[in-house]
Amino acid sequence: IHMPWILCNMHARGYAGCNMHAGCKEAGCKEALFTLGDKPELRYSTAQKELSKLGFQTTLEYLRAMALMVFEETGLLPHLNPGLLDAKDITSLREVSVSMGIMLESSSDRLMEKGNCHHGSPDKAPSVRLSTIDDAGRQKVPFTTGILIGSGETRRERIETLLALRKSHEKYGHIFSII
């Protein structure tokens, strides 16, 4: 389920979108995937205005409501990929989802340096992404994650990224999929 923020009205898309997906269960679908960016209301005034019209202060409040609605109306199991989350966010969303995820992409801080692919993107910092992954683990949330190949990383950095994910999983036992 794509939750667009700028090009279409969130109210119409949210509620009509749910009706559109009602036939998914009959087609054999079991899960509804919600994927979106990191708190777009902080970056785009249009997103904040749309949320406000709907009576929500944050994207995560809206996501929580939509995940619950999809589950109640269709029986599809919500899997949430909403970007960076803190422990409080995970606690709130855990009540309306069967699993969550975020791509680690890379554990290399080098990719954050000027001239590299994650420069100027604080949400891509390995430490904050690993923090979300570990917070989910502490709460026993089934989790999916992954690495990004082809972004300028070295073979060694790919291996280190996989090892960082293994370390988190060995500690908490929550990662069920690495893509």
Question: Which role fits each region the language model picked out?
Answer:
Residues 2-5, 11-12, 17-168:
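Conserved Radical SAM active-site core
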